[in-house]
C-alpha cells in the first residue's frame, strides 16, 4: 500500500514538473515576433525602459512581450540599456531577443557610400543611415587635428571613403 502511494505522489510530481517546464518553455522560448519577416528595432542613447517596450510592442506577441518584461525586471535591464539596431527574426524567443539587446549584439547595417564630390554631401548621406549627426561628422572630416591623427589632411581625407557597400554597426 505504501509503495502504491509513493508511486502515485512521484507520478503526480513528475507530471507537475513536466507541465511547469512546458509553460516556461512556451513563455520564454516560443516565437517572440508575430511577423513572418525580420524586423529591426533601433535603441537610441536617450531611450529608457518604457520607450524600449513601446518600440518592441508592435512586433511582439502578447506572451513574448510579457516574458521580455519579466526578464528585464529580474535582470535589471533598465540600468544596462545598450544603443544599437537589433534584429528580431521569426522564431526567436523572448529570451533570445532579450539576450541580444542586453549584450549589445547588434545586426549590421549595409552602408552604401555614394560617389559624391563634397564632404558635406558625404556627411549627409552617411548620417541618414547611421546614428550620427551630419554636422558633427562634417566637422570631424574637415578638422585639421582629426585628419592629422589619421595621417591625412583635409584635402586627402576623402580618399578614405571609397564608394562601395560596407557592413557597419548602427551606432
PLM feature spans:
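Conserved catalytic or metal-liganding residues and their short signature motifs at active sites
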Residues: 1-171
